[in-house]
A protein has these predicted regions:
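Loop/turn elements at helix/coil->beta-strand transitions in domains of secreted/extracellular proteins
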Residues: 1, 26-32, 61-68, 97-101
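Solvent-exposed loop/turn segments at secondary-structure junctions
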Residues: 7-13, 36-41, 66, 73-77, ...
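Surface-exposed acidic, glycine-flexible loop patches that form ligand/cofactor-binding
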Residues: 21-26, 58-59, 148-151
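Catalytic His-Asp segment of secreted/periplasmic serine-dependent ester chemistry enzymes
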Residues: 75-160
Length: 160
């Protein structure tokens, strides 16, 4: 069963209090947590972001869920206006501290833009390109999940 809890324009700190109920109700085995953009827009301090992210990941782990943190989307239009790299670094550190996966959407999309795979500077209402970008993101995420599942299966075999 797949469920989605979408909370647009909500900062990480504001999501954390509601996690306990969601986790208790849904009992997920995997949580993919996309966060950070609203925090960057609101200028949330890196340490405050880290604390909220750490609290959220801890709640997910305590509920028995595996965690994938997904960082922000890349946009050359907002690259000079928002400092997302600091919060993306915080996400990487929190993922490492919790032995969680990080899906580096920011890095992937930046690479696609820089290599010309996608022109992410084009009009924001280009729905065909947005669909193709999200399709590729979905495939990359699925690949990471499958790879992680294979690694976990291999670890389980070696510990038996």
């Amino acid at each position: 069963k797949v469920t989605a809890h979408i909370q647009p324009r909500v900062a990480t700190a504001d999501m954390v209090p509601g996690l306990a109920k969601i986790l208790a109700d849904d009992k997920p085995s995997l949580v993919i947590w996309q966060t950070g953009t609203t925090d960057a827009i609101n200028g949330v301090a890196a340490e405050d972001f880290r604390t909220s992210l750490d609290d959220g990941v801890t709640a997910m782990e305590n509920a028995g869920a595996n965690v994938i943190l997904m960082n922000m989307q890349y946009s050359p239009r907002t690259d000079s206006m928002l400092d997302v790299s600091t919060l993306a670094d915080v996400m990487r550190i929190v993922a490492q501290q919790h032995n969680a996966l990080l899906f580096d959407r920011l890095g992937i999309m930046r690479s696609w833009n820089d290599s010309g795979t996608f022109d992410l500077y084009t009009a924001t209402k280009n729905y065909d390109m947005a669909r193709r970008v999200h399709d590729c993101i979905g495939r990359a995420l699925a690949t990471q999940i499958i790879s992680a599942a294979h690694l976990d299966a291999m670890r389980m075999q070696t510990t038996r």
